[in-house]
Amino acid sequence: MKNNIITPRYNLEGVFLRQIHSFVCRKGRTTTSQLSAIKKYWSLIGVDFQLNALNFSSIFKHRAPIILEIGFGSGESLVKTAMNFPEKNFLGIEVYKSGIGSCLHYASSYQIQNLRIIYYDATEVMYNMIPDDTLSKVQIFFPDPWHKKRHHKRRLLKNIFLKIITKKLIIDGILHIATDSESYAFYILDEIKDIKNYKNLSEKNNFVKRPVSRIITKFEKKGLLQGKKIFDLMFQLKK
Protein backbone atom coordinates (compact mmCIF):
# COMPACT_ATOMS: atom_id res chain seq x y z
CA MET A 1 0.00 0.00 0.00
CA LYS A 2 1.41 3.35 -1.06
CA ASN A 3 1.24 6.14 1.51
CA ASN A 4 1.60 9.12 -0.84
CA ILE A 5 -1.96 10.01 -1.85
CA ILE A 6 -1.13 13.12 -3.88
CA THR A 7 0.80 13.08 -7.12
CA PRO A 8 3.94 15.26 -7.32
CA ARG A 9 4.02 18.66 -9.04
CA TYR A 10 4.70 16.93 -12.36
CA ASN A 11 3.86 13.36 -13.32
CA LEU A 12 6.22 10.93 -15.04
CA GLU A 13 5.38 12.41 -18.46
CA GLY A 14 6.29 15.90 -17.27
CA VAL A 15 2.67 17.07 -17.29
CA PHE A 16 1.86 19.81 -14.79
CA LEU A 17 -0.65 18.62 -12.22
CA ARG A 18 -3.27 20.56 -10.31
CA GLN A 19 -2.32 21.90 -6.89
CA ILE A 20 -5.71 22.71 -5.32
CA HIS A 21 -7.26 19.68 -3.65
CA SER A 22 -10.77 19.01 -2.36
CA PHE A 23 -9.41 17.70 0.92
CA VAL A 24 -6.82 18.54 3.56
CA CYS A 25 -4.28 15.95 4.69
CA ARG A 26 -4.96 16.08 8.41
CA LYS A 27 -3.01 13.96 10.86
CA GLY A 28 -6.07 12.03 11.92
CA ARG A 29 -5.70 9.14 14.32
CA THR A 30 -5.63 5.72 12.71
CA THR A 31 -6.50 3.05 15.27
CA THR A 32 -4.58 -0.14 15.88
CA SER A 33 -7.43 -2.22 14.45
CA GLN A 34 -7.53 -0.06 11.32
CA LEU A 35 -3.79 -0.43 10.79
CA SER A 36 -4.11 -4.16 11.37
CA ALA A 37 -6.88 -4.39 8.76
CA ILE A 38 -4.71 -2.53 6.25
CA LYS A 39 -1.82 -4.91 6.86
CA LYS A 40 -4.01 -8.01 6.57
CA TYR A 41 -6.44 -7.13 3.80
CA TRP A 42 -5.00 -4.41 1.57
CA SER A 43 -3.43 -6.97 -0.77
CA LEU A 44 -6.85 -8.61 -1.19
CA ILE A 45 -9.11 -5.58 -1.58
CA GLY A 46 -6.83 -2.58 -2.13
CA VAL A 47 -5.72 -1.26 -5.51
CA ASP A 48 -2.56 0.86 -5.68
CA PHE A 49 -2.59 4.11 -7.64
CA GLN A 50 -1.13 3.94 -11.13
CA LEU A 51 -0.75 6.31 -14.07
CA ASN A 52 -2.49 4.06 -16.57
CA ALA A 53 -6.06 2.83 -16.92
CA LEU A 54 -7.26 -0.12 -14.87
CA ASN A 55 -8.31 -3.38 -16.44
CA PHE A 56 -11.42 -4.09 -14.39
CA SER A 57 -11.48 -7.74 -15.42
CA SER A 58 -8.14 -8.18 -13.65
CA ILE A 59 -9.25 -6.72 -10.30
CA PHE A 60 -12.77 -8.14 -10.08
CA LYS A 61 -13.52 -11.85 -10.09
CA HIS A 62 -16.68 -11.52 -12.17
CA ARG A 63 -17.75 -9.28 -15.03
CA ALA A 64 -20.55 -7.03 -13.75
CA PRO A 65 -21.75 -3.40 -13.77
CA ILE A 66 -19.30 -1.17 -11.90
CA ILE A 67 -20.39 1.35 -9.29
CA LEU A 68 -17.81 3.91 -8.15
CA GLU A 69 -18.14 5.66 -4.79
CA ILE A 70 -15.95 8.69 -4.15
CA GLY A 71 -15.18 9.51 -0.51
CA PHE A 72 -16.69 6.55 1.31
CA GLY A 73 -15.75 7.68 4.83
CA SER A 74 -15.72 4.74 7.24
CA GLY A 75 -16.84 2.45 4.42
CA GLU A 76 -19.65 0.90 6.43
CA SER A 77 -22.44 1.94 4.05
CA LEU A 78 -20.33 1.08 0.98
CA VAL A 79 -19.65 -2.42 2.30
CA LYS A 80 -23.32 -2.98 3.18
CA THR A 81 -24.39 -1.77 -0.27
CA ALA A 82 -21.90 -4.13 -1.92
CA MET A 83 -23.30 -6.93 0.23
CA ASN A 84 -26.87 -6.03 -0.80
CA PHE A 85 -25.99 -6.06 -4.50
CA PRO A 86 -23.65 -9.04 -5.08
CA GLU A 87 -24.48 -8.93 -8.80
CA LYS A 88 -22.57 -5.64 -9.13
CA ASN A 89 -18.94 -4.64 -8.65
CA PHE A 90 -18.04 -1.72 -6.38
CA LEU A 91 -14.95 0.49 -6.45
CA GLY A 92 -14.35 3.01 -3.65
CA ILE A 93 -11.93 5.93 -3.42
CA GLU A 94 -10.88 7.50 -0.12
CA VAL A 95 -8.06 9.84 0.93
CA TYR A 96 -8.08 9.22 4.66
CA LYS A 97 -6.15 6.25 5.98
CA SER A 98 -8.52 5.73 8.90
CA GLY A 99 -11.38 5.31 6.43
CA ILE A 100 -9.36 2.82 4.40
CA GLY A 101 -8.62 0.74 7.51
CA SER A 102 -12.22 0.90 8.67
CA CYS A 103 -13.57 -0.15 5.27
CA LEU A 104 -11.15 -3.08 5.06
CA HIS A 105 -12.24 -4.18 8.52
CA TYR A 106 -15.94 -4.13 7.55
CA ALA A 107 -15.29 -5.83 4.20
CA SER A 108 -13.32 -8.65 5.80
CA SER A 109 -15.98 -9.12 8.49
CA TYR A 110 -18.69 -9.62 5.85
CA GLN A 111 -16.35 -11.51 3.47
CA ILE A 112 -17.18 -9.12 0.64
CA GLN A 113 -15.93 -10.32 -2.75
CA ASN A 114 -17.24 -7.61 -5.09
CA LEU A 115 -15.45 -4.59 -3.62
CA ARG A 116 -12.09 -2.95 -4.34
CA ILE A 117 -10.79 0.33 -2.88
CA ILE A 118 -8.19 2.92 -3.81
CA TYR A 119 -6.29 5.13 -1.34
CA TYR A 120 -5.70 8.28 -3.39
CA ASP A 121 -6.99 11.65 -4.58
CA ALA A 122 -10.20 10.99 -6.54
CA THR A 123 -9.46 13.53 -9.27
CA GLU A 124 -6.13 11.91 -10.09
CA VAL A 125 -7.76 8.47 -10.03
CA MET A 126 -10.47 9.61 -12.44
CA TYR A 127 -7.93 11.19 -14.80
CA ASN A 128 -5.48 8.29 -14.80
CA MET A 129 -7.09 5.03 -13.71
CA ILE A 130 -10.75 4.93 -14.73
CA PRO A 131 -11.29 3.94 -18.39
CA ASP A 132 -13.84 5.90 -20.38
CA ASP A 133 -17.36 4.47 -20.81
CA THR A 134 -17.06 1.87 -18.04
CA LEU A 135 -19.03 2.99 -14.98
CA SER A 136 -22.72 2.24 -14.57
CA LYS A 137 -22.97 4.59 -11.60
CA VAL A 138 -20.93 7.18 -9.72
CA GLN A 139 -22.06 8.01 -6.19
CA ILE A 140 -20.70 10.83 -4.07
CA PHE A 141 -22.28 11.08 -0.66
CA PHE A 142 -21.71 14.06 1.65
CA PRO A 143 -18.62 15.60 0.04
CA ASP A 144 -17.00 18.43 1.98
CA PRO A 145 -19.09 21.53 1.17
CA TRP A 146 -16.27 23.98 1.95
CA HIS A 147 -18.74 26.59 3.19
CA LYS A 148 -16.50 29.66 3.15
CA LYS A 149 -16.54 31.43 -0.21
CA ARG A 150 -12.76 31.65 -0.38
CA HIS A 151 -12.67 27.85 -0.12
CA HIS A 152 -15.18 27.17 -2.91
CA LYS A 153 -12.23 26.51 -5.23
CA ARG A 154 -11.64 23.35 -3.18
CA ARG A 155 -15.08 21.93 -3.85
CA LEU A 156 -14.89 18.60 -5.64
CA LEU A 157 -18.12 18.94 -7.61
CA LYS A 158 -17.16 21.77 -9.91
CA ASN A 159 -18.08 21.90 -13.59
CA ILE A 160 -14.73 20.49 -14.73
CA PHE A 161 -14.97 17.42 -12.50
CA LEU A 162 -18.61 16.82 -13.41
CA LYS A 163 -17.53 16.82 -17.07
CA ILE A 164 -14.85 14.22 -16.32
CA ILE A 165 -17.53 11.95 -14.89
CA THR A 166 -19.48 12.12 -18.17
CA LYS A 167 -16.52 10.49 -19.90
CA LYS A 168 -16.36 7.64 -17.41
CA LEU A 169 -20.07 6.77 -17.27
CA ILE A 170 -21.73 4.51 -19.80
CA ILE A 171 -24.74 5.88 -21.67
CA ASP A 172 -27.73 5.86 -19.29
CA GLY A 173 -25.29 5.64 -16.38
CA ILE A 174 -26.21 7.41 -13.15
CA LEU A 175 -24.55 10.15 -11.11
CA HIS A 176 -25.97 10.21 -7.57
CA ILE A 177 -24.97 12.93 -5.11
CA ALA A 178 -26.17 13.48 -1.55
CA THR A 179 -25.40 16.47 0.67
CA ASP A 180 -26.74 18.08 3.83
CA SER A 181 -25.66 21.53 2.63
CA GLU A 182 -28.45 23.40 0.85
CA SER A 183 -26.04 25.97 -0.57
CA TYR A 184 -23.78 23.23 -1.95
CA ALA A 185 -26.79 21.41 -3.43
CA PHE A 186 -27.81 24.50 -5.41
CA TYR A 187 -24.17 25.16 -6.29
CA ILE A 188 -24.01 21.68 -7.86
CA LEU A 189 -27.22 22.28 -9.81
CA ASP A 190 -25.70 25.50 -11.14
CA GLU A 191 -22.41 23.83 -12.06
CA ILE A 192 -24.11 20.96 -13.90
CA LYS A 193 -26.90 22.82 -15.72
CA ASP A 194 -24.79 23.61 -18.81
CA ILE A 195 -23.52 20.05 -19.25
CA LYS A 196 -26.04 18.89 -21.84
CA ASN A 197 -25.30 15.17 -21.43
CA TYR A 198 -26.81 15.10 -17.93
CA LYS A 199 -30.55 14.62 -17.49
CA ASN A 200 -31.84 15.56 -14.04
CA LEU A 201 -34.09 12.71 -12.87
CA SER A 202 -36.07 15.02 -10.60
CA GLU A 203 -39.54 15.93 -11.90
CA LYS A 204 -38.90 19.48 -10.72
CA ASN A 205 -35.36 19.51 -12.11
CA ASN A 206 -33.82 19.78 -8.66
CA PHE A 207 -33.83 16.99 -6.04
CA VAL A 208 -35.11 13.43 -5.75
CA LYS A 209 -36.26 11.36 -2.79
CA ARG A 210 -33.60 9.19 -1.19
CA PRO A 211 -33.63 5.86 -3.04
CA VAL A 212 -33.89 2.77 -0.84
CA SER A 213 -30.54 1.60 -2.21
CA ARG A 214 -28.73 4.50 -0.49
CA ILE A 215 -28.13 3.37 3.06
CA ILE A 216 -28.44 6.06 5.73
CA THR A 217 -25.00 6.57 7.26
CA LYS A 218 -24.15 7.38 10.88
CA PHE A 219 -23.11 10.84 9.69
CA GLU A 220 -26.52 11.32 8.08
CA LYS A 221 -28.42 10.05 11.13
CA LYS A 222 -26.57 12.56 13.28
CA GLY A 223 -27.48 15.36 10.90
CA LEU A 224 -31.14 14.34 10.78
CA LEU A 225 -31.30 14.37 14.56
CA GLN A 226 -29.96 17.93 14.42
CA GLY A 227 -32.78 18.86 12.04
CA LYS A 228 -30.67 19.03 8.90
CA LYS A 229 -32.29 18.45 5.53
CA ILE A 230 -30.71 15.99 3.11
CA PHE A 231 -30.58 16.73 -0.60
CA ASP A 232 -30.31 13.88 -3.11
CA LEU A 233 -29.41 14.80 -6.68
CA MET A 234 -29.58 12.22 -9.44
CA PHE A 235 -28.60 12.58 -13.08
CA GLN A 236 -28.57 10.18 -16.02
CA LEU A 237 -26.04 10.40 -18.84
CA LYS A 238 -27.59 10.80 -22.29
CA LYS A 239 -26.04 10.93 -25.74
Swiss-Prot record:
UniProt binding sites for S-adenosyl-L-methionine: 69, 94, 121, 144
Disulfide links within the chain: none
Catalytically driven reaction(s): guanosine(46) in tRNA + S-adenosyl-L-methionine = N(7)-methylguanosine(46) in tRNA + S-adenosyl-L-homocysteine
Keyword field contains tRNA processing: yes
Keywords: Methyltransferase, S-adenosyl-L-methionine, Transferase, tRNA processing
Superkingdom to which the source organism belongs: Bacteria
Active site, renumbered: 144
Residues that hold substrate according to the record: 148, 180, 217-220
UniProt KW tRNA processing keyword: yes
Record-linked Pfam families: Methyltransf_4
EC numbers, comma separated: 2.1.1.33
GO CC annotation, single: tRNA methyltransferase complex
One GO MF term: tRNA (guanine(46)-N7)-methyltransferase activity
PROSITE patterns: SAM_MT_TRMB
Function, as annotated: Catalyzes the formation of N(7)-methylguanine at position 46 (m7G46) in tRNA.
Subunit structure: Monomer.
Family: Belongs to the class I-like SAM-binding methyltransferase superfamily. TrmB family.
Name of the featured protein: tRNA (guanine-N(7)-)-methyltransferase
Gene source species: Buchnera aphidicola subsp. Acyrthosiphon pisum (strain APS)
